[in-house]
Amino acid sequence: MSAASLYPVRPEVAATTLTDEATYKAMYQQSVVNPDGFWREQAQRLDWIKPFSVVKQTSFDDHRVDIKWFADGTLNVAYNCLDRHLAERGDTIAIIWEGDNPSEHREITYRELHAEVCKFANALRGQDVHRGDVVTIYMPMIPEAVVAMLACARIGAIHSVVFGGFSPEALAGRIIDCSSKVVITADEGLRGGKKTALKANVDRALTNPETSSVQKVIVCKRTGGEIEWNRHRDIWYHSLLEVASSTCAPKEMGAEESLFILYTSGSTGKPKGVLHTTAGYLLYAALTHERVFDYKPGEIYWCTADVGWVTGHSYIVYGPLANGATTLLFEGVPNYPDITRVSKIIDKHKVNILYTAPTAIRAMMAEGTKSVEGADGSSLRLLGSVGEPINPEAWGWYYNTVGKQNCPIVDTWWQTETGGILISPLPGATALKPGSATRPFFGVIPALVDNLGNLIEGAAEGNLVILDSWPGQSRSLYGDHDRFVDTYFKTFRGMYFTGDGARRDEDGYYWITGRVDDVLNVSGHRMGTAEIESAMVAHPKVAEAAVVGVPHDLKGQGIYVYVTLNGGEEPSDALRTELRNWVRKEIGPIASPDFIQWAPGLPKTRSGKIMRRILRKIATAEYDALGDISTLADPGVVQHLIDTHKTMNAA
């Protein structure tokens, strides 16, 4: 281990930590040798209505994949996040809300949040929402989004939060897949000083005849902007609350009853409805939040994610609130009104823990030290990174410039499907290496396998798999268990395949090398190449499209699209712009292509399979590293693409 790249645990951190090195080793050992005993003990941190007797019933056998934790116990998630804190922490701030406009902020106590959640839970019941019904939440980053999630959990409804940046078409697809009964939205969203037409997007989504399961649309007033109104379907959020009782008994839920669906991009195009259940998910979110962030009562914790992504679910809402923490909810973006926004929020609210994405870090880093000019930052004691691997340069900048060399960085690796953090340093236990996610969390058994599924020992690189279940693991894909099995358990039998590659160094530290399937990681958000390709070929002028990821200074991965036009169509800059706007409309701004290269043909095998490996190499100008092209039906296509790429780069 080279001393230059190693950041040992700081003595002052080790002295006050919840988990030092000896504790980590002892707890990790117990968690993998005796998972039943370990998780039985950890589950006592939750309040149960009916205690469980059986801890773990799990099988990764691809003929009968079945994952159950604490299956005969009952509890309620909202009770665990709210009610049980009222006696001792009722007047503690649960949510600090920071608006897009720096002049707007609110503080909401646990008692106030509990009252509003109960009112809205009663309002949902009044709209015929009951246990097992699906509610779609398409909201800006405002407290009402959290209220809606917890209100669903309180009455046993299943929430499906859809990121407010998704287009009406993408929203409709997600509503149709889960037969959503109610949609909760806002008149408009505010982000970076711009308004987003959320209610108008819902209206457009619901013109799709297949969305007929939706009975009501509940609208929260955010901007007061003018919107269309369907008096038979639309209801104001605030008018419902005005007449609702603040008393609502939490529904007794089985440990394995569904809590939420969250759609994530798949390599086959159609988004996957990742299904999480009640007890195991909540326990895992709470325990990882406490131990990874070394959270202590009274601290101000800020995760910059959106609740439309799993990071927002686990580490803005459920993990922090289950722990009685103060969680900061930010409506805006890191560079509005200017690049100092993050630093100003840290100082304004005396933030102790900052959990953000490499995309935001790179955006601040691009401005040098401007982002911290005039900032104090002395409240910070811990930094976190999530969404994609952080390159060592960005890690160093984050550590030196934002953390002033005083704050450990927890570089966390996990997925929508994992429910919570799987590989991460613990600040009081783990010596840090910039760019490494380091070591597994309790109960997590990672391994590397070659392409045939053979385990690789020692320092090596391979496909990252997990050998046994953990409580936060997704149980299925909504309405499609076969796809769940095919996606995660068929590639390497008896193991959970993450879809990521990794290397393990001589100290047993893991370094995530990125996706090995056709899924891109754009600004920490997963985008399926097939989803973007499908949107592109839906354009009347496009015959064929192939999407690959390329390195991007700000986003981590950029979207590079090769486009073959229909006969008679001519390439032009105007058409490039038209295609970019088309994809934005079909999927959302997040999927907007960074590069479009015209291609008279694509490199295909004789069976018709597009050789994306070759397209990736051309997109990154690695012309001499194309590998074997003898299997191509028309090898001449490759040289044409290389020539075009060189011309584009020279332009």
From Swiss-Prot:
Q: Is-annotated flag, keyword Nucleotide-binding? A: yes
* Cytoplasm found in the keyword field: no
Reaction(s) the record says it catalyses: acetate + ATP + CoA = acetyl-CoA + AMP + diphosphate
Q: List the disulfide bonds.
A: none
UniProt-annotated binding residues for Mg(2+):
537, 539, 542
Q: What does the UniProt keyword field contain?
A: Acetylation, ATP-binding, Ligase, Magnesium, Metal-binding, Nucleotide-binding
Which GO BP terms apply?
acetyl-CoA biosynthetic process from acetate
Chain coiled-coil ranges: none
Q: Tell me which residues bind CoA.
A: 191-194, 311, 335, 523, 584
Residue positions annotated to bind ATP are 387-389, 411-416, 500, 515, 526
Spell out which residues are annotated as carrying N6-acetyllysine: 609
**Gene Ontology CC annotations of this record:** cytosol
Q: How is it modified after translation?
A: Acetylated. Deacetylation by the SIR2-homolog deacetylase activates the enzyme.
> Would you identify the family this protein belongs to, as annotated?
Belongs to the ATP-dependent AMP-binding enzyme family.
Q: Which PANTHER family match?
A: ACETYL-COENZYME A SYNTHETASE
Q: What does the UniProt function comment say about this protein?
A: Catalyzes the conversion of acetate into acetyl-CoA (AcCoA), an essential intermediate at the junction of anabolic and catabolic pathways. AcsA undergoes a two-step reaction. In the first half reaction, AcsA combines acetate with ATP to form acetyl-adenylate (AcAMP) intermediate. In the second half reaction, it can then transfer the acetyl group from AcAMP to the sulfhydryl group of CoA, forming the product AcCoA.
This protein's name: Acetyl-coenzyme A synthetase
Q: Which organism is it from?
A: Pseudomonas savastanoi pv. phaseolicola (strain 1448A / Race 6)
